Design a protein with these regions (language model features):
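Membrane-interface motif at the C-terminal end of an N-terminal transmembrane signal
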Residues: 41-58
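Short, well-structured alpha-helical segments in soluble
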Residues: 194-207
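N-terminal Lys/Arg-rich, disordered targeting/topogenic segments
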Residues: 1-26
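Conserved beta-strand elements of the Class I
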Residues: 140-144, 181, 209
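N-terminal Sec-pathway targeting helices
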Residues: 19-40
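Serine-dependent acyl-ester chemistry module
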Residues: 25, 60-70, 208-304, 309-319, ...
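Histidine-centered active-site loop/cap adjacent to the catalytic His
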Residues: 33, 44, 49, 322-360
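Membrane/wall-proximal cationic-aromatic binding patches
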Residues: 57-167, 171-172, 313-316, 360
Length: 360
């Protein structure tokens, strides 16, 4: 082979190598441009969906705080004037744990304690320790609800469930014991309350279940956006897709969450033969007390017994009974307990003698 031919072959090989390198380079550039395009598109989508997400949340009445990680430093100074908890990145707080139950989303942390004011028992609810097995001479009432029932900014003994327990104990003979267990959890809505009823409350074998209903229990977001903290994903796009599925139901029926939850509660009552009574609490809106439109009609359709405290609050100086738009002062808790007590006795919902308890 002549030197000229060798040179030609070398040039051909170099050209092929150069062309191959160019092709690889072009592929890399195209992939890079494609990825960059995806990033830009995703960024635009995030901005777009964030805008529409805000619109949907506003339409659905969801309250979203600017920063869901509340400043809980005040708890260390004055727990009675605080009431907010620092949420960690893993979805926990000093008194909350992220629940394995997707319907509950979060629960109270067993044995959590804050400055002698907030104590969570080993069962994961704010009350004294109670055995799951109920003694034979005890009539046990389970109270389920949100932060109003929990006792926002109040001591346990000042909450309406414990005041109701004291009233019932004073009414009967020494041999008769009443237990009123407080299963309230701040931020829970009606569906979470129904799920809590099924997976935890029934384990304590209650004879009667009371559900404290607040008008915001039917909203998608409630009590300072706790729901939002657990529902919101790292991506606005993913969050928007989730939110749209809920919005479609909300748009079709503004009571869809309450309707679904209270049907479940009714089923639980029928399955277990445990009576359930709904206590309807007020919410201040402007200068008036707000009542969820259609809720009482829903309860009547389901044949669920209820007792509304709204007119009773309206007849009194309700601003002295309310700590804010939904939560009660100590006087408000006492007023609520007294009226629930009278409702239970007047309608003979609770036994009034030892013999009646024995036969229950």
């Amino acid at each position: 082979m002549t030197p000229l031919m060798n040179t030609t072959n070398d040039l051909t090989s170099e050209n092929k190598s150069t062309q191959k390198s160019r092709r690889i380079g072009n592929v890399v550039i195209n992939i890079g441009l494609f990825i960059a395009g995806l990033c830009v598109s995703f960024g635009i989508a995030e901005i777009f969906f964030a805008t529409w997400e805000s619109y949907l949340l506003k339409t659905m009445g969801v309250f979203v705080p600017v920063d869901p990680k509340y400043d809980g430093a005040a708890w260390e100074v004055d727990p009675m004037q605080a009431g907010r908890f620092v949420w960690q990145a893993d979805g926990n707080s000093i008194v909350h744990i992220r629940s394995k139950n997707k319907k509950l989303m979060y629960e109270l942390r067993p044995n959590a304690e804050i400055s002698e004011i907030i104590k969570i028992n080993s069962g994961g609810f704010r009350d004294r320790e109670y055995p799951k097995e109920k003694p034979s001479n005890v009539f046990r009432i389970a109270v389920v609800g949100d932060s109003v029932t929990f006792g926002w900014r109040q001591r346990l003994e000042d909450t309406y469930p414990k005041k109701l327990e004291a009233l019932l104990q004073n009414h009967n003979t020494p041999n008769t014991q009443f237990e009123v267990l407080n299963f309230g959890i701040g931020g829970y809505n009606a569906e979470q309350e129904a799920e809590l009823l099924r997976v935890k409350v029934l384990d304590y074998h209650p004879d009667l279940i009371l559900i404290g209903f607040c008008p915001n229990d039917g909203q998608i977001g409630f009590d300072g956006g706790l729901w939002w903290h657990f529902f919101h994903g790292p991506s606005r796009t993913v969050s928007f897709i989730r939110l749209m599925s809920i919005y479609q139901e909300y748009k079709a029926d503004s009571l869809f969450l309450l309707r679904r939850a209270y049907r479940d509660i009714l089923n639980i009552s029928q399955e277990t033969n445990i009576p359930v009574h709904i206590c309807i609490f007020p919410m201040i809106q402007g200068d008036e007390l707000y009542v969820t439109p259609g809720f009482i009609q829903l309860l009547e359709q389901l044949n669920l017994p209820y007792f509304s405290l709204v007119p009773l609050f309206a007849e009194n100086d309700y601003k002295q009974l309310m700590l804010d738009t939904v939560h009660f002062t100590v006087a408000g808790h006492e007023f609520t307990a007294q009226n629930i007590y009278e409702y239970l006795v007047r309608n003979k919902i609770v036994p009034l003698s030892t013999s009646e308890i024995a036969n229950n």
